[in-house]
């Protein structure tokens, strides 16, 4: 097995303390000064990349599936979930980027140094499970694409996905940037199709605006669909990924350099997620308008009743005519493959950060994909396309329930003076992010408990079987609650931000509560060579 172990264990002291002894500090500091003299737009372009790579996760097959079903089942009533979800995603993605810029380490590495061994292993397993859960919609979406393009059974397409992404990763050495550009363009081809269809079906603007700004959960399954939407939008592994991707950029370690880096990554993420918001709104609106049309044929009405990725190409007939299925299939294939690449990198950084293990990308992809294929293959054989579509919703709900175990550490670390120094979150960001975070966590816990209790009451199992199931599941629910509370109330014990005395007086004067924490304006942010092989333009 091709595994590389890092030669030494990282200490708990930040890179700013160790960099002071670097023999090349003066040379790198001069490079920093040259970087800071460049025009702002050039420095911004140097930071472009991580946000757009992360935003691909908001256009993956899981998002498309939940968007299509939300529109078909509830028209525009759940658009507010997408709006709140992407606003929250922008906040936490920017916090993840800030964490990487300020500390020079990504979220998984900081979790490893902060938590006890048992907790660290627990968080690592949950993070790996999140990557696998995120990969399931990509496996099924790609299988649906093969079914649409080549008319092969879905379960055969699931097997093919085990090698398709490996081939794509292998082709990167022949032109990574061109390959990524091609994939992105194919994904946006589908976006353009939905925008074109949107201009034809013309959904009522008033209803769309009401759906965006008036929260409603009417009708059967609205709560489950809303949680699935959140799970598809706010993915735990994306937080690990974004905090690592920013380390591939050479950000000067001066006060201005750090602030500029955080600001540039915020602008880039904001633009990328705004585009993702528009695309998600377009998909929901097209689905809601087309499936509620008075002129809908009986065949299309039957498809709307059980809408899934493999039956949605008819929504684009007005734009593409007979070729709608082919274009939709190609775009769906691109969506699944591009999202899988980001998932592969996220899994690599999670393993490297928690365990200090670096695995070859093809091996990492093979491991994740093999595990993700198993449930997809079983469900597609037994339940066919309909069962596979339901599995996507279940995977999205799993992601939503796993969110606290990446979100709470991120919120605590980015708000901690010992981790971020004077760059920690403002009180407004702390209050708003914790409010939304705890709200989502509370909704998930409420839905989990009420859904399970309702299932126990109304299922057809014998009473003794219900007792056994309840006795097995309720302890896990208790462990879930205890784990969330533990992560929330536990105090940070490891300092990752070490001040330099040369600027302590300045920072103390500007910020009375900064204590002895300051920013070393002379030491360069270490370029992470171990994270530099990311396929992004520099």
Curated annotation (Swiss-Prot):
Chief localisation class: membrane
Organism: Oryza sativa subsp. japonica (Rice)
Alphabetized PANTHER family for the sequence: METAL TRANSPORTER NRAMP5, SOLUTE CARRIER PROTEIN FAMILY 11 MEMBER
Role played: Probable metal transporter.
Disordered: annotated span: 518-538
Family: Belongs to the NRAMP (TC 2.A.55) family.
GO biological process: iron ion transmembrane transport; manganese ion transport
Keyword annotations of the record: Ion transport, Iron, Iron transport, Membrane, Transmembrane, Transmembrane helix, Transport
Gene assigned in the entry: NRAMP5
Name assigned to this protein: Metal transporter Nramp5
Subcellular location per the Swiss-Prot or TrEMBL entry: Membrane
Transmembrane spans: 44-64, 77-97, 118-138, 140-160, 181-201, 227-247, 264-284, 324-346, 365-385, 391-411, 427-447, 467-487
Source species, domain of life: Eukaryota
Gene Ontology cellular component annotations, sorted alphabetically: plasma membrane
Listed GO MF terms: cadmium ion transmembrane transporter activity; manganese ion transmembrane transporter activity
HAMAP family given in the database record: NRAMP
Membrane topology, record value: Multi-pass membrane protein
């Amino acid at each position: 097995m091709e595994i590389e172990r890092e030669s030494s264990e990282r200490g708990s002291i930040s890179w700013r303390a160790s960099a002071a002894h670097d023999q090349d500090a003066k040379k790198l500091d001069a490079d920093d000064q040259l970087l800071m003299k460049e025009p702002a737009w050039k420095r911004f372009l140097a930071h472009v990349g991580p946000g757009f790579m992360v935003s691909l996760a908001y256009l993956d097959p899981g998002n498309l599936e939940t968007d299509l079903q939300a529109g078909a089942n509830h028209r525009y009533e759940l658009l507010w979930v997408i709006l709140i979800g992407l606003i929250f995603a922008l906040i936490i993605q920017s916090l993840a980027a800030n964490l990487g810029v300020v500390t020079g380490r990504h979220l998984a590495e900081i979790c490893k140094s902060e938590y006890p061994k048992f907790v660290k292993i627990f968080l690592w397993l949950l993070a790996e499970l999140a990557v696998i859960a995120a990969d399931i919609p990509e496996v099924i979406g790609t299988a649906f694409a093969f079914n649409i393009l080549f008319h092969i059974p879905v379960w055969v397409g699931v097997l093919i996905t085990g090698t398709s992404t490996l081939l794509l990763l292998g082709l990167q050495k022949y032109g990574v940037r061109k390959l990524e550009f091609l994939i992105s363009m194919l994904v946006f081809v589908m976006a353009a199709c939905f925008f074109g269809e949107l201009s034809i079906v013309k959904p009522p603007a008033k209803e769309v605006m009401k759906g965006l700004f008036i929260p409603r959960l009417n009708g059967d399954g609205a709560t489950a669909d809303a949680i699935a939407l959140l799970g598809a939008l706010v993915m735990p592994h994306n937080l690990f990924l974004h905090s690592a991707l920013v380390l591939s950029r050479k950000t000067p370690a001066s006060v201005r350099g750090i602030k500029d880096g955080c600001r540039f990554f915020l602008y880039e993420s904001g633009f990328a997620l705004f585009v993702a918001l528009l695309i998600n709104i377009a998909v929901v609106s097209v689905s809601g308008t087309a499936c509620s049309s008075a002129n809908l044929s009986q065949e299309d009405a039957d498809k709307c009743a059980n809408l899934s990725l493999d039956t949605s190409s008819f929504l684009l007939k007005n734009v593409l005519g007979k070729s709608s299925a082919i274009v939709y299939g190609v775009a769906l294939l691109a969506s699944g493959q591009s999202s899988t690449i980001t998932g592969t990198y996220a899994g690599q950084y999670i393993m490297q950060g928690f365990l200090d293990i670096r695995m070859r990308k093809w091996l990492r992809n093979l491991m994740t994909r093999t595990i993700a294929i198993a449930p997809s293959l079983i469900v597609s054989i037994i339940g066919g396309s309909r069962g596979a579509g339901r599995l996507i919703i279940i995977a999205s709900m799993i992601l939503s329930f796993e969110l606290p175990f990446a979100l709470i550490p991120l919120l605590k670390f980015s708000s901690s003076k010992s981790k971020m120094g004077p760059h920690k979150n403002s009180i407004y960001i702390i209050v708003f992010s914790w409010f939304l975070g705890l709200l989502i966590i509370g909704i998930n816990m409420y839905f989990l408990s009420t859904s399970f209790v309702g299932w126990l009451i109304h299922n057809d199992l014998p009473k003794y079987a219900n007792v056994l199931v309840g006795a097995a599941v309720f302890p896990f629910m208790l462990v879930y609650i205890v784990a969330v509370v533990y992560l929330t109330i536990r105090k940070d014990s490891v300092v990752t931000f070490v001040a330099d005395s040369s600027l302590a007086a300045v920072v103390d004067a500007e910020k009375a509560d900064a204590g002895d924490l300051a920013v070393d304006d002379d030491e360069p942010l270490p370029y992470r060579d171990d994270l530099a092989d990311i396929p992004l333009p520099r």
